[in-house]
Amino acid sequence: YLADSIYSGIIKPYGVFSEDVNGIVYVTGDTRFESLNQDSTIFILPVNCWKFVDGEVFLANASVYDVFSDENNLILQALDDYYLSDGRTCSTTRRVLAFIASGFINYYNSGEQTVAEKFLKKYYLCNNSEEFKSSLLKIFNNQN
């Protein structure tokens, strides 16, 4: 199985049909962000989308929007629930850091940098948001 051969970290890889590429893409976790889960009780990673073409595997993030949208809808719901139950504080932000990073990077992967910025402003409630954003983008830019 192709999806099992791509290192996916804590995310179980899965295949899904994408209208954006009119075919199957394989969704895996982006293991570069695993360290953000060290203080979490629920683990999550941003995702990468891969396309299999003519015997080769290609990163298809720039071509796939719908998968990132679906992933982020789940993240948005989870964050809203956490902030509703635990309060909109920096302390809550620290507990859901991996969710925030995943949503932000998923928006970047889908080409929605402006939406990513708005997302970060809404959900990252600590004073060091620029530092956090810079650290995420440094990791993100190492592959892309």
Indicate residue ranges for each PLM-predicted region.
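Acidic, small-residue rich beta-repeat scaffolds with periodic aromatic anchors
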Residues: 29-144
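Generic structural motif recognizing short loop/turn segments at the entrances and edges of beta-strands
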Residues: 12, 21-25, 46
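Acidic/hydrophobic-patterned starts of short beta strands in beta-sheet-rich repeat architectures
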Residues: 18-34
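Repeated scaffold domains used in trafficking and secretory/extracellular systems
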Residues: 8-18
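A short beta-strand motif characteristic of beta-propeller blades
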Residues: 2-7
